[in-house]
């Protein structure tokens, strides 16, 4: 053996690993794609939108669902052609410019990193309600550390946890749909809720068309997460096939789980029912009470606890992978792309992404969660910014691929007209949010945050910061053909 071999081995041993190992199976991705659109916003938060718009909130969920379906179709087209852990952030980089990928990547990371703290807070409150001997912040810390350990292990562990979290949520929704359908058909033997009476008894749109528009803006927050599967698919054996399958299924998932559930609720429960807007009750709790289900609050709290743990788990995974992708492109410190040699997990990114959760635990312990609420306001419209970036990226990438004669395996419908329609709808929604006032602060705070990040991205692009990492990642510049 050459004497250079031992030296070569030492060099390799001292060189940080920067490759993901993968390991997600098809069943993991299937359930992750379902879990991505089912969260506490459905089980509890939807009550606020129902109280706002009445039964016509169904139109808001249908409208929001259509927008998400179109955004996922556009993202699916790009992801099948070029699977990447950075997903839409990478595509924005290639199609629009480095500043765009930089901005949307960091905004998306901020959203999920901050959301983890809120999920830990909710989990802590639920567990404290069950077992009051331990303070809520103690339970929040326990949840944070436990799921941090899960994400430190290989990606298959994350997939397994998310599979079972998602399964619990799916079973809960299916049972609710069955019970609700029986009640609508006058076949449910318990409770006071039977038939369709509340759908029109106080008017289908009691607060006017404007309330539906405002509710639609709130609904958009609930749908974010559907795109996570395009990030995770890059760590599977056949990313293209998995993305096609899950993207096609997003239509029935949104129709069944969201529109179906909300339709049953507004039929069985008056839109002004006490408890719909209370955090301690929520949509499913009020509906189950109407169906005469004993211990409804305990059941819903268990489902919500599962949902927030699932969301925390997905948030930590997604945030760490976005940091990894940003680092690979020279848009974050290169230490963020270091992965474990055995696990292939970007453990530095996982740890950094969890810091907001630990900050939330500290704020809970010191009664300063109002500060966290202010930070959360800057996340309110990030979903719309993400969908806008997806639409512009798909528009540019499709035009370039068509010019080169590339045949796409998965395509956006009615291109470019539906893409233009999505852009117009999102811009109109943002303008409406500013004019109407209910979500004005969210738009302003998110826009300020985005403006700061855009400026940083432009500086990085102009001065060539991180160009070595970009060259190693073999990223074509946005204007390349």
What function would you assign to each model-found segment?
Residues 183-184, 374, 378-386, 414-481:
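A generic transmembrane alpha-helix motif of multi-pass inner-membrane proteins
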Residues 21, 44-140, 253, 259-260, ...:
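Extracellular loop-to-transmembrane helix junctions
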Residues 1-4, 8, 89-94, 99, ...:
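Helix-loop-helix connectors at the membrane interface of multi-pass transporters/channels
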Residues 124, 137-194, 224, 247-255, ...:
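Membrane-interface loop-to-helix entry segments
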Residues 90-92, 97, 129, 215, ...:
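TM-loop-TM module centered on a large, flexible mid-protein loop between adjacent transmembrane helices
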Residues 15-20, 57-58, 132-135, 167-302:
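Helix-loop-helix junctions that connect adjacent transmembrane segments
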Residues 1-47, 51-56, 68-73, 85, ...:
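Membrane-interface "cap" regions at the ends of multi-pass membrane proteins
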